[in-house]
Amino acid sequence: MQPAAPPHPAELRRAALALLEQSDPQAKACGTRALFAARDCLSLDAAVVLRPSAPLPGRPQRPLLMPALRVPQRSLATVKGRAALLHAIAHIEFNAINLALDALWRFPGLPSAYYRDWLQVAAEEAHHFTLLREHLLGLGHDYGDFDAHDGLWTMTARTAHDPLARMALVPRTLEARGLDATPPLQRKLGSAGDARAVEILEIILRDEIGHVAIGNRWYRWLCHRGGLDPVALYPELAARYEAPRPRPPFNLSAREAAGFSAEELALLGA
């Protein structure tokens, strides 16, 4: 039985912050989806400068977090190995809920469409997490059973002061890596006989194209507002914030569908 979604404030950005502070993964996921369902009943105060009342992000005691290179790699030939891989993906999706909620509450003074876009992203990430957790439970495991790393939130913290840097380096960089990584993961899980995992990853890939497109749209909007060239600015931001360099193979069709220009796609191989 899923926990009931916690009550949330009637103002969208305050509600997003309250959910980001929530430490229970299932309550966070359920609450985020409930917030999206109630979106037409919520007010929006885009001007208010909010302050967290608890450390961010709220998260459970487990999984234990460690550097990515210390997270054990397991064979997909075993159920435990498949569960470990699915747990790693679930952890990414849990962090993605936090990333979207943070983009929603943190930055004042943006158009209402920006906040609505990131609410949709948060709800879809919550759906992905729920699908993966349900599949994990079917394999005899749960979220928190394996160790994980914290790379996604690290970049979120680095860009906490600047929505332009956030749009450039979280959705357009870190989340775009998922577009490249998903098809090989689908092939591996398909070879291991996990058809349900392949189906879930297909849902995730479809939605993530839209999420990266939202990041592209608001990155370009913020560049236009500041009179900046989005293509020329990106490598400067990537170097300044020490963003990871994209690694091949690239899913060029998905990246194109997500709004990367031909010039940007050509630069991937430069």
Please give the residue ranges for each predicted region.
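Non-heme di-metal
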Residues: 1-270
